[in-house]
Amino acid sequence: MALITLRKNLYRLSDFQMHRALAALKNKPLNHVHKVVKERLCPWLCSRQPEPFGVKFHHAHCKKFHSKNGNDLHPLGGPVFSQVSDCDRLEQNVKNEESQMFYRRLSNLTSSEEVLSFISTMETLPDTMAAGALQRICEVEKKDGDQGLPKEILENSIFQALCFQFEKEPSQLSNTSLVTALQALILLHVDPQSSLLLNLVAECQNRLRKGGMEVRNLCILGESLITLHSSGCVTLELIINQLQGEKLETFTPEDIVALYRILQACTEKVDEHQTFLNKINNFSLSIVSNLSPKLISQMLTALVVLDQSQAFPLIIKLGKYVVRHVPHFTNEELRRVLEAFIYFGHHDTFFTKALEHRVAAVCLTLDPEVVCRVMEYCSRELILSKPILNAVAETFVCQTEKFSPRQISALMEPFGKLNYLPPNASALFRKLENVLFTHFNYFPPKSLLKLLHSCSLNECHPVNFLAKIFKPLFLQRLQGKESHLDTLSRAQLTQLFLASVLECPFYKGPKLLPKYQVKSFLTPCCSLETPVDSQLYRYVKIGLTNLLGARLYFAPKVLTPYCYTIDVEIKLDEEGFVLPSTANEDIHKRIALCIDGPKRFCSNSKHLLGKEAIKQRHLQLLGYQVVQIPYHEIGMLKSRRELVEYLQRKLFSQNTVHWLQE
């Protein structure tokens, strides 16, 4: 009875022309049948076990059974295909009711065993249905993670018979069946060098050269070849050329994203394809509303890789639709969206609000790399989001062990940059200090310096670690193989040293050698100060000239001996009279005007950035009377007279000063 069942199952694959194979098996005992099938099929079947590195798996009938880590098959670091969906595209190609019923039943099956059991009951199995069965097996296995097929499925005679006919007679398959089978087998981690995949790829390339493949099949084939590292850009160029001849209006959203990903694989020829890319970018505006979260993240990633900064209308529209998908993105998809927004410098209030809700709700379950990208997004765009920062601080305190040294640095740096201390600041920095004590040498030198400098911006001075970073050994590590230490690192070291002198007088450790110090924190490439807003300065200068009577009574952009540049300096004598800016004697008080434009504040609030807060703090400790002139106060003044009165109140609140009439 068992032999009849096996023969029946194999016979029902009639469209694969299996009658001759059955005739040969007909007179053999059952154990011989299983032995023959296994010995023929096992050399090219491949399974991935849940191991972090490449593995090999052998069993009694499969001496050549071999698997590589699936990560090796993903050169672009993203999901392999733009859409591996519910067999819908195959169902569209089927005309008769019986076949449509097959696909409906297939889509309801939830395990590989159910799929194989179902197809074993079929009287006939056309190639499109066989390919659909493979694809459904792929889909249900992927739901449990990227781990390949279990041993019991690989050894199932129905599954082996399916694969055997795909290997033996690929020329008999339809275009859709061919590329669908190739797609599914790749996702099931069949060995790229197996005769099965080599035969399928060769047949695909042969049909590609002949032309006439449909758009969807070309897109699937292109992504398959990318995954296999097959044929380089030569075959992909042929696919791109054929797709260029098609009307974009006939492409589905999945096809458009696949096209982006194919172009993404040929970045060295992006200039040659730019005209085509411009056409795709413009057309994509019409399909954004139909993109799934996965497709949106893939399109954004492709735009980054292809450096499509000029496609800003598309980026803005994608950003608009990203907002509604924030709750539904996977960790990986959210990470890619954030990377794209960081790359293009895009942000908006609605996305930030959606991100706040997502992070606050699930921060403890977010992948560490996603948490770092969220913090980098806030840091790059200068977004002070208290819900996000508070949630991340709580996550770090509760789950410190899941973050690497590099990630800890990336996670903590925005707190200093945005000049914000969360409610659990004491627990946060106590936990950080413990990590630094135990893992100090595991931190990359530059990441460590950024981390400690960020703490100092927030008045959380890393006194216990200053002695270590000022030592020549650490400074040599920081310099690495370069001929000299970079300007930014020297500036951060200098500001840490200045903070130790001004704010930590009890620190008695090593000092920073003069050769590692900078003369000014205001440098063109990597400044620790924000240059004064030129338009705002000109407006204030007019008011000061009217208030003080002449231009000679104040000096602009004064570099102090302590590396800081003062926007405007005013000198007073002991009686409070204003001295000429050139005076060097009888100076009783120096006023430092900080003309703070929008770039000195967080982008979404009137909260001063960390680097400006430490500057004003240090100037006060150095004896300056710091007077802040923020842009939002200046913007409310309606006349020059109001400006002069405003400056008088700021500078000389207790004195009577006369100014010139307008």
Swiss-Prot record:
GO terms for biological process: mitochondrial cytochrome c oxidase assembly; mitochondrial RNA processing; positive regulation of mitochondrial translation; regulation of mitochondrial mRNA stability. Expression detected in spleen, thymus, testis, ovary, colon, heart, smooth muscle, kidney, brain, lung, liver and white adipose tissue with highest expression in liver and thyroid. Belongs to the FAST kinase family. One of its GO terms (molecular function) is RNA binding. It holds the Pfam family FAST_2. The lineage of its organism: Eukaryota, Metazoa, Chordata, Craniata, Vertebrata. GO terms for cellular component: mitochondrial matrix; mitochondrion; nucleoplasm; ribonucleoprotein granule. InterPro entries: FAST_2, FAST_kinase, FAST_Leu-rich, RAP. This is FAST kinase domain-containing protein 3, mitochondrial. Its main location: mitochondrion. Keywords: Mitochondrion, Transit peptide. The gene is FASTKD3. Signal peptide: none annotated. Residues 591-649 form the RAP domain. Required for normal mitochondrial respiration. Increases steady-state levels and half-lives of a subset of mature mitochondrial mRNAs MT-ND2, MT-ND3, MT-CYTB, MT-CO2, and MT-ATP8/6. Promotes MT-CO1 mRNA translation and increases mitochondrial complex IV assembly and activity.
